[in-house]
Curated annotation (Swiss-Prot):
This is Serine hydroxymethyltransferase. One of its GO terms (molecular function) is glycine hydroxymethyltransferase activity. Pathway: One-carbon metabolism; tetrahydrofolate interconversion; Amino-acid biosynthesis; glycine biosynthesis; glycine from L-serine: step 1/1. Its main location: cytoplasm. It comes from Chlamydia abortus (strain DSM 27085 / S26/3) (Chlamydophila abortus). GO terms for biological process: glycine biosynthetic process from serine; tetrahydrofolate interconversion. Keywords: Amino-acid biosynthesis, Cytoplasm, One-carbon metabolism, Pyridoxal phosphate, Transferase. InterPro entries: PyrdxlP-dep_Trfase, PyrdxlP-dep_Trfase_major, PyrdxlP-dep_Trfase_small, Ser_HO-MeTrfase, Ser_HO-MeTrfase-like, Ser_HO-MeTrfase_PLP_BS, SHMT-like_dom.
Length: 497
C-alpha cells in the first residue's frame, strides 16, 4: 500500500513551493490513516468538507498549518499548573520559555500591560475575568474589613455572608438579543448569572445600535460593580472612551469582551476610541476568530488585576494546555506581520462590500450595515426563519448560522435572522469581486426558499425547500469560487484517498 506521504512527495517532485510544513502535515495524516484509520479518515473528510463550503460563520476562520503543527506534539504530555517560573510541578523550564514568549508576544501585539494566555476558551477567559473582579473588588475588601489575611481565615458564617454579598453586586452587560454573548450573564442557564446579579442593556429599538445615554442611565440606576462591553452578533464598533467614562462615573470595572474583533484591534483597524486596550480594566478574547489562531482564550488586564489573574490556578483553572499555548504564540507572531494588518483591513472592506450588495437587492440588515467583520440579515420580510435559511444555505455549500435579532418573534432556536462573517473567506484571499458574487448567490437562494407543506396541508415552520435548478446553480457557483481560492492549497487533495 502506497502511503499518503509517498504519493504526495511523488506528485510534488520537481514542483516549486514544496515546504516542510505541508510535508509534516501529510506525514501526520499518513500515520493516523495507517494506525487509526477511522480517525484519520474523519480528519481528511473534514478537510474535504471545509474545502467544499464557503465558511461564513463569523466566529470561524482558518489557522495556518504552522499553528496546527504547533499543537500536535509532546507538549501535551506536560502538566504545568501555575504560571511561568511559578509552577506546582517540576521540570517545566521549556513550557516556561514557551508561555513566557507567548505572553510577551501578546503584550507587544496589543500594547497591553499584562497578558494571561492559559484559558482554554473564550468562556474560560470570561469566567476568569469575573472571578478576578469578584476577588479584587468584593472578596479582598471584605476579608480586609473583617481583619483577616486570606479568605481561608473566615468562619463558615462569615463565608456564607460573603457569598451572599457577592451575589448582590450588579453586573451590567449586553443582552443576547442585542448581540451579547451567553457568558455576559444575561442568560440564566449560564454560570455567569449565578455569580452576581446580572442586568441586561439593550440596543435602541429604532437604530438597533447601543445607546450610550441609556447605558449611562442604567449605570446610574443600578450602580454596577462591572460594566461589560463587547458582542458576538453586533455589526458596529464601540466607543470605549465613552464606555470608560460611564463606568468611572459609578466606580464600575470596565470589562471588554473582544473575542470577535481582537484581530481587528491587532491589525490596526480599530484605533483610538475604538481600541479597548487603553480604556478597559480587563479584556478577554478568543484566539481562533479574527486572530486566526488555535481554539483558546486570552486575558489582558491592567496591573491592578495582573496578580489575581495569574493565580487562575487555583482560582478556577487547573492545568493549562502547553501545546495550545505554543500554537497561540505562533498565531500571535503571525499577527505582528504587515500581511496580517492588510488582512484585517480587507476583512472589514469585504464585510462592507457584502453588505452593500445585500442592501442593493432589498435585504434588510440590522443597524443598516456593518463597520466590522460581520452582518446580520433580518429574514422577517422573506417569511422564513434563520434555521430554515441556515439549513438551505448549508445544502448549497454556504455555512452561516441562525441568529436572534432584537425583539425576535420567532424565538431563540429558530430565530428571525442569520449572521454572516468575512474572516474565513478573506483568509482564502477573496476580495470585493468575490463578495459581490457571494451576495448574489445568497440573495437568489434566500428569495427562492419556500416553506415545506406538511401532511395536513399546513406549512412547516422549521423546514424549507429550494427548487433543484436554483440549488444546482448555487452549488456550481460556490464550487467555482472555491476552485479559485482553495483551502490549504499546499495540501493536494488528490493524494487524500
Amino acid at each position: 500500500m502506497v502511503s499518503l506521504l509517498h504519493k504526495f512527495l511523488e506528485n510534488a517532485s520537481g514542483k516549486k513551493g514544496q515546504d516542510l510544513a505541508s510535508t509534516a502535515y501529510l506525514a501526520a495524516l499518513d500515520h493516523l490513516l495507517h494506525s487509526f484509520p477511522s480517525i484519520g479518515k474523519s480528519i481528511i473528510d473534514e478537510l474535504k468538507s471545509q474545502r467544499s463550503r464557503l465558511k461564513m460563520i463569523a466566529s470561524e476562520n482558518y489557522a495556518s498549518i504552522s499553528v496546527q503543527l504547533a499543537m500536535g506534539n509532546l507538549l501535551t504530555d506536560k502538566y504545568c499548573e501555575g504560571s511561568p517560573f511559578k509552577r506546582f510541578y517540576s521540570c517545566c523550564e521549556n513550557v516556561d520559555a514557551i508561555e513566557w514568549e507567548c505572553v510577551e508576544t501578546a503584550k507587544e501585539l496589543f500594547g497591553a500591560e499584562s497578558a494571561f494566555v492559559q484559558p482554554h476558551s473564550g468562556a474560560d477567559a470570561n469566567l476568569l475575568a469575573i472571578m478576578a473582579i469578584i476577588t479584587q473588588k468584593i472578596q479582598g475588601p471584605a476579608v480586609k474589613r473583617l481583619g483577616y489575611k486570606t479568605i481561608n481565615d473566615l468562619t463558615d458564617k462569615e463565608y456564607t455572608e460573603l457569598k451572599a454579598e457577592i451575589g448582590s453586586h450588579v453586573c451590567l452587560g449586553p443582552s443576547l438579543n442585542s448581540g451579547g454573548h451567553l457568558t455576559h450573564g444575561t442568560v440564566r442557564l449560564n454560570i455567569m448569572s449565578k455569580l452576581m446579579r446580572c442586568v441586561p442593556y439593550e440596543v435602541n429599538k429604532k437604530t438597533e445600535c447601543f445607546d450610550y445615554s441609556e447605558i449611562a442611565r442604567l449605570v446610574r440606576t443600578y450602580k454596577p460593580t462591572v460594566l461589560i462591553a463587547g458582542y458576538s452578533s453586533y455589526s458596529r464598533r464601540l466607543n470605549f472612551s465613552t464606555l470608560k467614562q460611564i463606568a468611572d462615573d459609578c466606580g464600575a470595572v470596565l470589562w471588554v469582551d473582544m473575542a470577535h474583533f481582537a484581530g481587528l484591534v491587532a491589525g490596526g483597524v480599530f484605533i483610538e476610541e475604538e481600541n479597548p486596550i487603553p480604556f478597559a480594566d480587563i479584556i478577554t478574547t478568543t484566539t481562533h476568530k479574527t486572530l486566526r489562531g488555535p481554539r483558546g482564550g486570552l486575558v489582558l488586564a491592567s496591573k491592578e488585576y495582573d496578580a489575581v489573574i495569574n493565580r487562575a490556578c487555583p482560582l478556577m483553572m487547573g492545568g493549562p494546555l502547553p501545546h495550545v499555548i505554543a500554537a497561540k504564540a505562533v498565531a500571535l507572531k503571525e499577527a505582528l506581520t504587515v500581511d496580517f494588518k492588510k488582512y484585517a483591513h480587507q476583512v472589514v472592506d469585504n464585510a462592507r462590500t457584502l453588505a452593500e450588495h445585500f442592501q442593493k437587492q432589498g435585504l434588510r440588515l440590522l443597524t443598516g450595515g456593518t463597520d466590522n467583520h460581520m452582518l446580520i440579515i433580518d429574514l422577517t420580510s422573506l417569511g422564513i426563519s434563520g434555521r430554515i435559511a441556515e439549513d438551505i444555505l448549508s445544502s448549497v455549500g454556504i455555512a452561516v448560522n441562525r441568529n436572534t435579532i432584537p425583539s425576535d418573534a420567532v424565538g431563540k432556536w429558530d430565530t428571525s435572522g442569520i449572521r454572516l462573517g468575512t474572516p474565513a473567506l478573506t483568509t482564502l484571499g477573496m476580495g470585493s469581486d468575490e463578495m459581490e458574487e457571494v451576495a448574489n448567490i445568497i440573495v437568489k437562494v434566500l428569495r427562492n426558499i419556500t416553506l415545506r407543506r406538511n401532511a395536513d396541508d399546513s406549512f412547516s415552520k422549521s423546514e424549507g425547500e429550494l427548487p433543484e435548478n436554483i440549488a444546482e446553480e448555487a452549488r456550481a457557483r460556490v464550487a467555482g469560487l472555491l476552485s479559485r481560492f482553495p483551502l490549504y492549497p499546499e495540501i493536494d487533495l488528490e493524494t487524500l484517498v
